[in-house]
Amino acid sequence: MPRSVFRLILVLAAAASLAGCSRALDRADLVFLNGAEPESIDPAVITGQPDGRVANALMEGLTAFDATGTAQPGVAERWDLSADGRIYTFHLRRDARWSNGETVTARDFIASWQRTLTPEVAAEYAYQLYYVRGARDFNEGRLKDFSAVGLRAIDDFTLEVALDNPTPFFLDLCAFVTLLPVHIPTIERCEKAGLNWTKPENFIGNGPFTLKEWRIFDRIRLVKSETYWNRANIGMKSIDILPSGRPMTAFNFYSTGLADLMADKGLVPTPLMNELKHRPDFHAAPFLGNYFIRFNCKRKPFDDQRVRLAFSLVIDKQLIVDKITRAGEIPATSLVPPGTAGYEPPPGLSRDPDRARQLLAAAGFPGGQGFPIVYYLFKGDSDLDRDIAVELQGMFSRELGITIQLQQQEWKVYLASLSSLDYDLCRSTWVGDYADPNTFMDMFVTDGGNNRTGWSNAVYDHAIEIAARELVPEKRFEIFRGAEKILISDEAPICPLYYYVGIQFYDATRLGGVEPNLLDEHPLKSMYWKQR
C-alpha cells in the first residue's frame, strides 16, 4: 500500500473515532492525550500518573508544582518553619474557595489527611504522610485518637504540621496528589446516599478546573473554575483529556490535529521513534523515572535471590534502549537515577551471563532444567511493554534455557495483580514524586504500599528510617547507597532496566506553559495559547 494512502486511512480512522464518541461536545480549548483511562480521581486511591494529572487540575494542595516542576505556594500563600525544622505553620489564602463557593480552611486539610490515613480506606500512598508526627501509628492502628497526630488548625486559615524529623522535601510532598484536599461534606453525603462523589454531578474541588463531563473511554471535560483564587491567570477555558493506551491511535489523533498535546512517553510509537525525534514538535528531556522488573519474592522460584540475580544478570539493557525505546534512554544500574538532588548511586550489577548460569544451577536449575512455568506480566495496551517483554523472553531463553510465558492485562487489572502479588515477574515503572532519593527508596520498605514484591529486609528498613533523620546530605546519601546495594546487587527483588526520558509532542510556537523538568510535571493550569 502506498505510504500516502496508508496515512490517509489513519487520518480518516482517527477522525471517525473521535466523531463517533464526541456526541454534542464542541472541541475544547486544549485537547490532551493522557494515556490510560484514569482509575480514579480520589487522592486517597490514586497510584497512576494519568490519574494524578487529572486530580491536580481539579484540586490544589498547600503547595503546587509549576511548569518547571518546582513547588510553589498553592492554597498556602506562605509558611514558617521552626528552628529545629520540625514544625511548619502554613498560612492559607483567605480567597481560596471550593467550587461550591465555600472557603477552604485548615480543617479541610486535616479532615482530608485523616481520611487518607484511616486504615479502612487502605490508601496505598498513605505512607507519604508518615513524616507527620503520629501519622504512621494512626494508619497502622496503634493510635486510635487522631487528635494526637501532629496536625492542628490554629484558626480557619492557619495550619500547623508537626513532623517527626526535619524533612527537606516536605514542601514538595504537600504538592503531591495524595495530600490534595477533598470536600469531606460531599463525600459523606454521597456515601450516605450510595452515590459516587467523583462523578461530575457530585464533585466539589478547589482546583483551577471543575469536572464537567466524564465519559469512560471517551474523554474527561474540564472547564475553568469560577471560584479558583488565581482564575485570572488560567489560560484555558476548557480542556478535553482523552484516554488512549495504544501509541499508534494516540499519535494519529495528535498528528491529524484532533489533539494538541501528547505528554506520555508510552504513547509514542516506538517503531517510528528514529523518525519522530527529529521533528520540531518532539520535546525530550531526562526526568526522575525508572523502568524496571519486579519479582514476586513470595512465590517460587523467585523467593530465591539466586534466581532473581540470575535473571537480572542476563538482561542486555543497552540492546533494549538501542533497539526498542530509541529516545536517548540510559541503561539503569540503580533504582535512583544518578544526580537526583546530588545523589550518586552505587555501581549496581553488570551483565554477566556466566555468573547467572552458575547462580541458577546453585538454585537447583542447571541449564534451566526443572524450572517451572512462569509468567511475565505487562500492560496489554502498550506496544512498548510488549516489545520489551518479547526481547526479555528471548534473552532468558538464550542465556538461561528458560522460556517464560507472556501475560497481558488491561491497566486496572494489571494494577490489581501487582497489589495482590498475583504475578511471577512483571513490568514496572516509577516516577519520582519529588526530587530526592527517598521517593524511590522508601517504596521497598517492608509492607510499603508500593513495595508490591513481598520482599522484606530489616537492614534495609532500618537504613531508610535512619536516612530520614540524618541532616548532613553526604552522610544521608551514604546510608542510601548502602541500602540501594542491598536492593539491587545483593537481594534483587527488582531489576532496573533504564532511566526514563520524558517526551512531549506539541507545537511550541503555539502552545506555552509546557516545560521539561525532572519530575515530568506539566500542570494544565500553566498552559496557554501563544497563537491559535
Task: Please tell me what each predicted stretch does.
Residues 28-39, 77, 87-90, 109-112, ...:
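Short, well-ordered beta-strand elements
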Residues 33-84, 114, 202-205:
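N-terminal lobe/hinge region of extracytoplasmic solute-binding protein
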Residues 36-53, 75, 102, 124, ...:
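A structural "hinge/loop" feature
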Residues 77-128, 160, 253, 301:
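Aromatic- and charge-enriched surface segment that lines or borders ligand/interaction sites
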Residues 126, 174, 233, 261-353, ...:
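Local pocket/hinge segments that shape ligand/substrate recognition
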Residues 135, 146, 152, 156-157, ...:
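Gly/Pro-rich hinge or "lid" segments in bacterial periplasmic/extracellular proteins
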Residues 168, 215, 314-344, 384-393, ...:
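Detector for C-terminal structural segments
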Residues 204, 240-252, 267-269, 406-416:
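Short helix-initiation/N-cap motifs at beta->coil->alpha
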